[in-house]
């Protein structure tokens, strides 16, 4: 007696298992037609498998008789309840609402059979003759109105999680790479400490509205100035925007000054913190903000900072100070505080616990020392110098630094907060 090769037995076993899986238990209709056939060869013998794999049929409108192979869902109206309907019927029903008396419908001479079929298929529309009138809306009772009001109050009630904040910065996202910065990657670089976590709660009173529970208090950072003070030489061609804003010494505006003449600039950064309990808002109303096309932003204050270079012995001004009227924004904030103001046309300001940072390499963040001789000097940086915005404390608005200028380099030391 010759036994069948093991490969043939294995193929027959696979075919039996595949057939048993395709034939559902208790199914009375014959299986669908064979659509796919897989063949392979092993040791010179050819094996094949037939499949009833599904065939994609695009959605179409049903017209006339549908072929038997079309995937159509049939729902019978002869009293049979499907599983989903039975489960819905088992749920507790809401108490009945008062409704108006139903209007008697005119009887149709044509009677529809009890076991009519409803066809549901993608792209199928009911014929115009079988269109039923829209059901009438039942008048709602007082209980339904009360239930709707209660649901509205429940949805509007504040939850424990942080809700969507509507008082955030308008038109600005510090994490957006598409924010326009005049093609300068160092202009107001955002050194934000971290993103607010989505699941955390608000710190009480902070980040939930505009602060008007006291007064702001601006404090410049003396160590920030001392760490990054340096001297730079630039041509007048690259200082055209700064010249428009009067950020240079008077000798730069003479008629004999050419574009390739160089200016010597004492550059330094500035970081101002609002450690008060109220927002520091611009002194000018929004409609009077000035648009600067060179820097592509609005200036909301006439004078936010003032820079002076004084002689170390006589305290006399040796370099003409200028007014720095930047735009105000929350560049970064301490942990637990959130940025709410941006350098835009809609909203500018400085929130409590946040910093307004100006790097040393942006326009007008300098003193023009082209006409200054080498020696020892004092750098004086004042914020809110004219006291245009009320503060809780004006004695911490000035920083003084000792500057040693060699003619090529500048060294800053001893930067402290001073009352004068």
Curated annotation (Swiss-Prot):
<dbReference type="Pfam" id="PF01186">
    <property type="entry name" value="Lysyl_oxidase"/>
</dbReference>
<comment type="function">
    <text>Responsible for the post-translational oxidative deamination of peptidyl lysine residues in precursors to fibrous collagen and elastin.</text>
</comment>
<keyword id="KW-0732">Signal</keyword>
<feature type="disulfide bond">
    <location>
        <begin position="241"/>
        <end position="247"/>
    </location>
</feature>
<dbReference type="InterPro" id="IPR001695">
    <property type="entry name" value="Lysyl_oxidase"/>
</dbReference>
<keyword id="KW-0886">LTQ</keyword>
<feature type="compositionally biased region" description="Pro residues">
    <location>
        <begin position="93"/>
        <end position="105"/>
    </location>
</feature>
<feature type="modified residue" description="Sulfotyrosine">
    <location>
        <position position="190"/>
    </location>
</feature>
<keyword id="KW-1015">Disulfide bond</keyword>
<dbReference type="InterPro" id="IPR019828">
    <property type="entry name" value="Lysyl_oxidase_CS"/>
</dbReference>
<feature type="disulfide bond">
    <location>
        <begin position="294"/>
        <end position="343"/>
    </location>
</feature>
<comment type="function">
    <text>In addition to cross linking of extracellular matrix proteins, it may have a direct role in tumor suppression.</text>
</comment>
<feature type="glycosylation site" description="N-linked (GlcNAc...) asparagine">
    <location>
        <position position="78"/>
    </location>
</feature>
<dbReference type="GO" id="GO:0005507">
    <property type="term" value="F:copper ion binding"/>
</dbReference>
<feature type="disulfide bond">
    <location>
        <begin position="354"/>
        <end position="364"/>
    </location>
</feature>
<keyword id="KW-0765">Sulfation</keyword>
<feature type="site" description="Cleavage; by ADAMTS2 and ADAMTS14">
    <location>
        <begin position="221"/>
        <end position="222"/>
    </location>
</feature>
<comment type="similarity">
    <text>Belongs to the lysyl oxidase family.</text>
</comment>
<dbReference type="GO" id="GO:0005518">
    <property type="term" value="F:collagen binding"/>
</dbReference>
<dbReference type="InterPro" id="IPR050912">
    <property type="entry name" value="LOX-like_protein"/>
</dbReference>
<keyword id="KW-0801">TPQ</keyword>
<protein>
    <recommendedName>
        <fullName>Protein-lysine 6-oxidase</fullName>
        <ecNumber>1.4.3.13</ecNumber>
    </recommendedName>
</protein>
<feature type="binding site">
    <location>
        <position position="297"/>
    </location>
    <ligand>
        <name>Cu cation</name>
    </ligand>
</feature>
<keyword id="KW-0325">Glycoprotein</keyword>
<dbReference type="GO" id="GO:0018057">
    <property type="term" value="P:peptidyl-lysine oxidation"/>
</dbReference>
<feature type="compositionally biased region" description="Low complexity">
    <location>
        <begin position="82"/>
        <end position="92"/>
    </location>
</feature>
<feature type="disulfide bond">
    <location>
        <begin position="401"/>
        <end position="415"/>
    </location>
</feature>
<keyword id="KW-0186">Copper</keyword>
<feature type="binding site">
    <location>
        <position position="299"/>
    </location>
    <ligand>
        <name>Cu cation</name>
    </ligand>
</feature>
<feature type="cross-link" description="Lysine tyrosylquinone (Lys-Tyr)">
    <location>
        <begin position="323"/>
        <end position="358"/>
    </location>
</feature>
<dbReference type="GO" id="GO:0062023">
    <property type="term" value="C:collagen-containing extracellular matrix"/>
</dbReference>
<dbReference type="GO" id="GO:0035791">
    <property type="term" value="P:platelet-derived growth factor receptor-beta signaling pathway"/>
</dbReference>
<dbReference type="GO" id="GO:0030199">
    <property type="term" value="P:collagen fibril organization"/>
</dbReference>
<dbReference type="GO" id="GO:0004720">
    <property type="term" value="F:protein-lysine 6-oxidase activity"/>
</dbReference>
<feature type="propeptide" description="Removed by BMP1">
    <location>
        <begin position="28"/>
        <end position="171"/>
    </location>
</feature>
<keyword id="KW-0964">Secreted</keyword>
<feature type="compositionally biased region" description="Basic residues">
    <location>
        <begin position="134"/>
        <end position="147"/>
    </location>
</feature>
<feature type="disulfide bond">
    <location>
        <begin position="327"/>
        <end position="333"/>
    </location>
</feature>
<dbReference type="GO" id="GO:0005615">
    <property type="term" value="C:extracellular space"/>
</dbReference>
<feature type="binding site">
    <location>
        <position position="295"/>
    </location>
    <ligand>
        <name>Cu cation</name>
    </ligand>
</feature>
<feature type="region of interest" description="Disordered">
    <location>
        <begin position="54"/>
        <end position="177"/>
    </location>
</feature>
<feature type="signal peptide">
    <location>
        <begin position="1"/>
        <end position="27"/>
    </location>
</feature>
